[in-house]
């Protein structure tokens, strides 16, 4: 069985399960594993027993933080599933998994429809062009509305859903689905508690009379959409002939793989209804590794030279390391997607990103945190490798004779930070180890040493992100430490252009001295477009020898780590080196580096420096009677209301609010709405801090 799959990639699906937090993603994954025979007992998220939530904190909090990889089989097809987190603080995990997937199942809450994080994850999937099917979950929930959810897929995502199923019954009476492809009803036992097969058995019945008209209407839309994919089908359609089930499925597959439509199915994973037809849809409609374009990379010697690697086991080996985890026995586990070629344990490969040779130890296919050893890793599959020394997320492993660098991943900068202080000298050593390991695993976790206070500062994507990292330091690395209050990661930038800023670095002490003269122009860049720094060399006629130019650049970049206003990192600066002078004996790389640092500080002081703060896109769902209080509160937090809409019995308010005003917001929101409102937030952009607020921040950081 497994051997066939290794050679026949049409029988492989690499998929992700993506959604908003609490839409039922992990429960859906658990059901998939149960029905495919990997699990003999269903693990419930609310019991803290699910297979893919294998870290202690995940089991306590009932949320998924790391994207565990699980392999299972359904109808002769191998499905490699990555269960991705829905919480906004863990977007890096989502981004990583989408980079290596071929398709995804987007899970929506049947009552809430498209929620903010569903939208974020959907846009991330758009970025990597990942074909998707939609599963409207929680159809048994009070207020669940399948048709409303389909409308939000159009309204909020701008996507084109293709409805393949209709729900039979709603809320407590939800018992099954109408299959519009084969025009039949699939009905599960009414009492799921008394069902000893846990939903594994269901009956095929006639479509209920009260749904017949609606089923015909949606079936007609489905057939019309499918007929447009092929001239022969279109002729058949216009001639009034019936399309066969095979023709309909082939048409849906073609449209899904091209991301032109998104098939929509429904069910209740918790009540064990609708999961098997969704698995059928994964096999029938989502792409195999052969359906997606060959992966692109570039030559090691020339970034402009594009190289492609087709999913073929006889081609040169190429794989992308997309995640690193620490295993209690094996140490570092490197999760990889093999794009081409194959390797066996003991093979030497090159880390093309770093130019270093590595020897692969053991190979595993993972089932959450259980590992199944394999004899070779082949194209189109996902594995965990051990024994690699110097590999980080986004590195390419490739054949030594045919190296290639695959497109890596870009990760957002952290927006929040806390100071962490070990309690004893022993804790200091443990903290260093913990930080190194955690930073290897998570590219959005950054660490710096505050030069003034000597404190270690850790940075992340949100309060929950940092909470969990600190928690892991305590549990896994036994670090006892005092943790400060969360602080906002401010930045500094400049608002106007300053020309011909000069600095002369001159030092004369016995023997050779130091000399470097530079003249520069500094101007603002558009940080909203991601332009953080640019260096241009316009020196002519050898006024500064070529070997000293990079030193000026390095000096500027060093000085940008701490801005002139309050010591926050400086961004959005274009630095142009115009002129300068050097001394045959006294000039050195160090002298020009110091001159670069000092000229930047001088230039920035004259370029109208300002403070920037992270703005969060906040969405609040509140009953109508609290709407006024919610809006008033957001305004008092310097928020700008962006929109107000209705959604299934509640009002949805979206606003841009500075992160600094949102600490403790959840408690205030609960008390203002008697615990009935919920909110979510995600990073939107950096914006200038109003002058009066900036003055307070600057005074505080200077200790005035």
Curated annotation (Swiss-Prot):
Residues involved in GTP binding: 19-26, 83-87, 137-140
Superkingdom of the organism of origin: Bacteria
Protein name (record): Elongation factor G
Signal sequence segment: none
SMART domains membership: EFG_C, EFG_IV
Chain's role: Catalyzes the GTP-dependent ribosomal translocation step during translation elongation. During this step, the ribosome changes from the pre-translocational (PRE) to the post-translocational (POST) state as the newly formed A-site-bound peptidyl-tRNA and P-site-bound deacylated tRNA move to the P and E sites, respectively. Catalyzes the coordinated movement of the two tRNA molecules, the mRNA and conformational changes in the ribosome.
SUPFAM superfamilies reported in the protein's UniProt record: EF-G C-terminal domain-like, P-loop containing nucleoside triphosphate hydrolases, Ribosomal protein S5 domain 2-like, Translation proteins
Family: Belongs to the TRAFAC class translation factor GTPase superfamily. Classic translation factor GTPase family. EF-G/EF-2 subfamily.
Pfam families reported for this sequence: EFG_C (PF00679), EFG_III (PF14492), EFG_IV (PF03764), GTP_EFTU (PF00009), GTP_EFTU_D2 (PF03144)
Annotated ranges, domain tr-type G: 10-290
GO CC annotations on file: cytoplasm
Gene Ontology MF term list: GTP binding; GTPase activity; translation elongation factor activity
Xref: Gene3D superfamilies: 3.30.230.10, 3.30.70.240, Elongation Factor G (Translational Gtpase), domain 3 (3.30.70.870), P-loop containing nucleotide triphosphate hydrolases (3.40.50.300), Translation factors (2.40.30.10)
InterPro entries cross-referenced by the UniProt entry: EFG_II, EFG_III, EFG_III/V, EFG_IV, EFG_V, EFG_V-like, EFTu-like_2, G_TR_CS
Localization per Swiss-Prot or TrEMBL: Cytoplasm
GO biological process: ribosome disassembly
Keyword terms of this UniProt record: Cytoplasm, Elongation factor, GTP-binding, Nucleotide-binding, Protein biosynthesis
Main location: cytoplasm
The keyword Nucleotide-binding belongs to this UniProt entry's keyword annotation: yes
